[in-house]
Curated annotation (Swiss-Prot):
The EC number(s) this enzyme carries: 7.1.2.2
Cellular component GO terms, alphabetical: plasma membrane; proton-transporting ATP synthase complex
Main location: membrane
Gene coding for it: atpD
Signal peptide positions on this chain: none
Organism in which the protein naturally occurs: Trichlorobacter lovleyi (strain ATCC BAA-1151 / DSM 17278 / SZ)
GO MF, any single term: ATP binding
InterPro entries the UniProt entry points to: AAA+_ATPase, ATP-synt_VA_C, ATP_synth_F1_bsu, ATPase_a/bsu_AS, ATPase_alpha/beta_chains, ATPase_F1/V1/A1_a/bsu_N, ATPase_F1/V1/A1_a/bsu_N_sf, ATPase_F1/V1/A1_a/bsu_nucl-bd
Bilayer topology term: Peripheral membrane protein
Function, in words: Produces ATP from ADP in the presence of a proton gradient across the membrane. The catalytic sites are hosted primarily by the beta subunits.
NCBIfam families: atpD
Family, per entry: Belongs to the ATPase alpha/beta chains family.
Name of this chain's protein: ATP synthase subunit beta
Length: 471
């Protein structure tokens, strides 16, 4: 079969127009290849994805790498298929880019199978409707905003409140406690963080349980807008062909939207609210609907969501909200108190915080913890104006317990051991429930509040209190 060859007619940043002979237009989403000597000396090293048909014989494409060095009139080859990513066990322990090429300098991936990056969501009859909780070993999450198996979880937070550290801890806990596979999509985040994650996963021995797909901040918007889809195809293989429960981490889903908005204007679309692309909800829906549980396995996804200027009503985080089963909101005020993970216990929500799913005892403890913390929050204005002495005895007790709960919600992480010097803790759900139940019931009213800071189970808090008393 003779190759379908076109030529470049115009280059505008990451968007390239290509002319073909009449009647030979490549389909939407087809991958085209062209040689860009500015990238490296390989032939056909730049992939373009067809985004629009312009008239009789011209297509508008999005480049997956740098377009510096391209010239008008250059030959472009239609591959006849969409961008494909290698899938299967050989992707574990490897880092690849948006077009499935390894970027870790460890040779070819050598996979047996490839999946296209644009795939249909599972049909309704194939989806599973079973609802069950997914234990993470992180107290604040398991108690107050539990994750659903096969659900979508949003990690909300501004810059520097600990989203990436929380994701790394989850990868660590899932690999070590559940032995499950993880797929990590680095979408438009810092290359240094991507490198740190790879190094730390290598050191902690979880790398061979994870596949990493990176399209970082320095990549053109085309790569950042598609890299999450590449990672999703890798995860879908483990779910559909190997019947696995897979964890898909996306850091950061906001950058997926941001990249889409960068290309949208160049594609000639009229911007919508706050300058975002008019197709924002559609693009997000196409990605999110593929993340689900089927009768064979599940994909549970944890998505870090950067909130521009801490504004949750911005269209990007607001659109992501609609798809989530649980939200873990990281708060700057809590981080300022030195409480890590800086999860806001009153702002974080979960669809499965329901006695029918998690059981009566867990539900009752979670609600009583939230009640005490909310009461403390309501009293803070009075404390600020009149001081603690003006409170009733009952309110003083509530404040004391709330401060203990606040500190007990902190926890040392395995992945932060090098920085904190404290060994990481994985806390079983039953120990988490027991600990908070005892604090709310007033069993530990006599212990100092600093005994509850950065410990795992309640037994460790009692031990720490004894050490503090001995000093």
């Amino acid at each position: 079969m003779s190759q379908n060859i076109g030529k470049i007619s115009q280059v505008i940043g990451a968007v390239i127009d290509v002319e073909f002979e009449p009647g030979k237009l490549p389909e939407i989403y087809h991958a085209l290849r062209v040689t860009n000597p500015a990238i490296d000396d390989r032939e056909n090293n730049l992939v373009l994805e067809v985004a629009q048909h312009l008239g009789e014989n011209s297509v508008r494409t999005i480049a997956m790498d740098s377009t510096d060095g391209l010239k008008r009139g250059q030959a472009v080859i239609d591959t006849g298929k969409q961008i494909c990513a290698p899938v299967g066990r050989k992707t574990l322990g490897r880092i690849m880019n948006v077009i499935g090429e390894p970027v870790d300098e460890m040779g070819p991936i050598g996979n047996e199978k490839e999946y296209g990056i644009h795939r249909e969501a599972p049909a309704f009859e194939d989806q599973s409707t079973k609802v069950e909780a997914f234990t993470t070993g992180i107290k604040v999450v398991d108690l107050l905003a539990p994750y659903a198996r096969g659900g979508k979880i949003g990690l909300f937070g501004g810059a520097g409140v600990g989203k990436t550290v929380l994701i790394m801890e989850l990868i660590n806990n899932i690999a070590k406690q559940h032995g499950g596979y993880s797929v990590f999509a680095g979408v438009g985040e810092r290359t240094r963080e991507g490198n740190d994650l790879w190094m730390e996963m290598k050191e902690s021995g979880v790398l061979d349980k994870a596949a990493l797909v990176y399209g970082q901040m320095n990549e053109p918007p085309g790569a950042r807008a598609r890299v999450a889809l590449t990672a999703l195809s890798v995860a879908e293989y483990f779910r559909d062909e190997e019947n696995q429960d897979v964890l898909l981490f996306i850091d950061n889903i906001f950058r997926f939207t941001q990249a889409g908005s960068e290309v949208s204007a160049l594609l000639g679309r009229i911007p919508s609210a706050v300058g975002y692309q008019p197709t924002l909800a559609t693009e997000m829906g196409e990605l999110q609907e593929r993340i689900t549980s089927t009768k064979k396995g599940s994909i549970t996804s944890v998505q870090a969501i950067y909130v521009p200027a801490d504004d949750l009503t911005d269209p990007a985080p607001a659109t992501a909200f609609a798809h989530l089963d649980a939200t873990t909101v990281l708060s700057r005020q809590i981080a300022e108190l030195g409480i890590y993970p800086a999860v806001d216990p009153l702002d974080s929500t979960s669809r499965i915080l329901d006695p029918q799913v998690i059981g009566e005892e867990h539900y009752a403890v979670a609600r009583s913890v939230q009640y005490v913390l909310q009461k403390y929050k309501d009293l803070q204005d009075i404390i600020a104006i009149l001081g603690m002495d003006e409170l009733s005895e009952e309110d003083k007790l509530v404040v004391a317990r709330a401060r203990k709960i606040q500190r007990f919600l902190s926890q040392p992480f395995h992945v932060a051991e090098a920085f904190t010097g404290s060994p990481g803790k994985y806390v079983e759900l039953k120990d988490t429930i027991k600990g908070f139940q005892e604090i709310v019931a007033g069993k530990h009213d006599n212990l100092p509040e600093q005994a509850f800071y950065m410990v795992g189970s309640i037994e460790e808090a009692i031990e720490k209190a004894a050490k503090l008393a001995a000093v």
